[in-house]
From Swiss-Prot:
<comment type="similarity">
    <text>Belongs to the nitroreductase family. HadB/RutE subfamily.</text>
</comment>
<keyword id="KW-0288">FMN</keyword>
<dbReference type="GO" id="GO:0016491">
    <property type="term" value="F:oxidoreductase activity"/>
</dbReference>
<protein>
    <recommendedName>
        <fullName>Putative NADH dehydrogenase/NAD(P)H nitroreductase Pnuc_0932</fullName>
        <ecNumber>1.-.-.-</ecNumber>
    </recommendedName>
</protein>
<dbReference type="InterPro" id="IPR000415">
    <property type="entry name" value="Nitroreductase-like"/>
</dbReference>
<keyword id="KW-0285">Flavoprotein</keyword>
<keyword id="KW-0521">NADP</keyword>
<dbReference type="Pfam" id="PF00881">
    <property type="entry name" value="Nitroreductase"/>
</dbReference>
<dbReference type="InterPro" id="IPR023936">
    <property type="entry name" value="RutE-like"/>
</dbReference>
<keyword id="KW-0520">NAD</keyword>
<dbReference type="InterPro" id="IPR050461">
    <property type="entry name" value="Nitroreductase_HadB/RutE"/>
</dbReference>
<keyword id="KW-0560">Oxidoreductase</keyword>
<dbReference type="InterPro" id="IPR029479">
    <property type="entry name" value="Nitroreductase"/>
</dbReference>
Amino acid sequence: MASVLNEQSLQQLFISARTHHTWKNTPVSDEQLKQIYDLFKYAPTSVNCSPARIVFVKSAAEKERLLQCVNPGNVEKTKNAPVTAIIGMDLDFYEQLPKLFPHVDAKSWFVGKDTFIEQTAFRNSSLQGAYLILAARAIGLDCGPMSGFDADKVNAAFFPDGRVKVNFLVNIGYGDESSLMPRQPRPSFDEACRIL
């Protein structure tokens, strides 16, 4: 049976963690990005479909291409982030199911069912993007997820073959805590949940 995480871990992953918009001038290494993936890849997805495809944008040239795709309000925060992760969803994810879920013919559940494919890819790549945020926080990084961008432009620039489509973006780095606003309220348990 798994043990309960200590208070420091819970604070780092959830309670004290914040969405960051400004960043310290501290680089994020390729090894850290690999570590993030090697953590979140183990988190669950439907039939282990693992549809997320991540582009970690670090170089100045590629960051400039990405800046042409984001909404004006997201330009500075993206420009100054050491890394921006493009969370994509592979619409051909089911082709990997014979390897990823070999004990049944799960691939046949998806072939020719475009709506089901897109729903599954979107839902599970969203899960994986959230797992990425937690993995980044777990290794001491901060994140700033964003949905303010032109999806067609992102797809044309970074996924031109049409097989992968962007879901959302996540800036990653070491956040500048001095620029954080006070934490905003959240719905209470009774407002958000029911026990039946």
